[in-house]
Amino acid sequence: MTQKIIRVGNIEIANDKPFVLFGGMNVLESRDLALKVCEEYVRVTEKLGIPYVFKASFDKANRSSVNSYRGPGMEEGLKIFEEIKRTFNVPVITDVHEPYQCEPVAQVCDIIQLPAFLSRQTDLVVAMAKTGAVINIKKAQFLAPHEMKHILAKCVEAGNDQLILCERGSSFGYNNLVVDMLGFGIMKQFEYPVFFDVTHSLQTPGGRADSAGGRRAQVTDLAKAGMSQGLAGLFLEAHPDPDNAKCDGPCALRLDKLEPFLAQLKQLDDLVKSFPTVETA
């Protein structure tokens, strides 16, 4: 099975290549914090030899509570992304929520992300595809892995095959998510790169009444399980003070644990991808 290669600058993204990190913070809390977080990611990934793309959101449009922090908005967020790109010479990924956001965001960011909750919204999918940008498609919590072929088809029909799939857990009753490890292999059969969003897979949606809870203590175990499947990359959020983060702190990695965490995953990825394929069908 031939695996499609997606190129972002000088980074090659494919299921059979060394894993790429989409990493950063959940939402842009401030310019200074974004620069601090990116600086640490750059230091660690350069040391470990992991290709890196900075991730953050300018607007969290699907917060549980109307009182929850959403972010600085698109205009201010894009200014911060431009500064991060200039300062650290790294690509940037962010999510869009409305068709009108697609073109201006794609002019600044190297990858635009389709949120899981919106992944079946055809008008949004088509608007994203028509930018020609690389698209990271989050698998909705309510979709089976094999159903992702329909979203891929919408993008291709609109003229864009620069696509990445991303697992972020499946609904398991109320306020819980689980990750089906068999789903990775199903999505890899589409030949597009597959990522694992370990951070959001640790959520307990609505678990704190007016916001999502999380299981940060299990991030290493779940990340190792996912990356053992031979994936194109990992999606990760970290924060210097997760307990006081403005969004999804309960499932964010502590920033000071980033290096030992990624060092183990780098070793695991190298090992898994050194194995010859064993055909068992």
UniProtKB/Swiss-Prot annotation:
Record key words, sorted: Cytoplasm, Lipopolysaccharide biosynthesis, Transferase
Gene Ontology CC: cytoplasm
UniProt keyword annotation of Cytoplasm present: yes
Entry EC no(s): 2.5.1.55
Subcellular location: Cytoplasm
GO MF entry, a single one: 3-deoxy-8-phosphooctulonate synthase activity
Keyword tRNA-binding: no
Cross-referenced NCBIfam families: KDO8P_synth, PRK05198.1, PRK12457.1
Name of this chain's protein: 2-dehydro-3-deoxyphosphooctonate aldolase
Family: Belongs to the KdsA family.
GO BP annotation list: keto-3-deoxy-D-manno-octulosonic acid biosynthetic process
Pathway, per record: Carbohydrate biosynthesis; 3-deoxy-D-manno-octulosonate biosynthesis; 3-deoxy-D-manno-octulosonate from D-ribulose 5-phosphate: step 2/3; Bacterial outer membrane biogenesis; lipopolysaccharide biosynthesis
Catalytic reactions on record: D-arabinose 5-phosphate + phosphoenolpyruvate + H2O = 3-deoxy-alpha-D-manno-2-octulosonate-8-phosphate + phosphate
Domain of life: Bacteria
InterPro entries, sorted: Aldolase_TIM, DAHP1/KDSA, KDO8P_synthase
